[in-house]
Amino acid sequence: MAINNNIIGEANQPSPHGGEMVRGFKNVFVKPDEQNRACSSYAMARKRRMKSNIIFDLGRILVGLDNERCIAAFERVGLEKIAFYVREHRVEDLFLAAEVGDITTPQFCDEVRRLCQCSVPDTDIIWAWNELLTGIPDAKKEALLALRRSGHRLFLLSNTNFMHWDKCAADFFPYRDSEGHTYTATHFFEKIFLSCAMHLAKPDPTIFTEALRQAGIKADDTLFIDDREDNCQAAQSVGITALHDPEGEIWYK
């Protein structure tokens, strides 16, 4: 599946943070030779706005999230207290500690057991926590491959924990196309940046500057796509153009 070129958003908006906010993909991905060649000045203007590098968020932008399913899973394994905390968006310190790699997966499970005063095994805790994730549609994987084939350099930058990443890498990213070619996460992205491995998290601007440095790319030639506006603003603050896509639907449809 290629990017839907019928999406026509507003023009790129200058941002007080330094980068730009993009409302649609047509100004970013469509190559000038795909436009009316007679409109040379228009095509050149579009070419100047194209970005060579695209940094994707993971949650909602690629993988679906289902809070209620996660809550039901914790209740199913007898962790009603954690289910309540997830519903009320509490225990942020525990989840954040896992997200920035301050605690290991076994330590996360130990803390869950301590909070619940129970002996639920690690496997059940990890299963319930991973029920937050619902998968990656094949259409999104095809769109990523289409972008790579068109010459874009793709990167992933996610606030995530090792449990969720392991689930995504093992079960959601693997893909076989219509010609029988198989792909894994590393085939879609040139580099993968995880908060739990970097000990940094969005919206800290440092995670963006570090990703740019490790990738060897320039902010002014890079687009960042995220479902959260504060993360987009942080990217803009270091000169990256941002696309705020709250439901993860704009970028590929």
Show the residue positions of the predicted features.
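Intrinsic-disorder-associated, low-complexity terminal segments enriched in Asp/Asn/His/Tyr and depleted
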Residues: 4-6, 12, 36
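N-terminal helical cap/lid subdomain that shapes the substrate entry/recognition surface
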Residues: 48-142, 149-150, 161-165
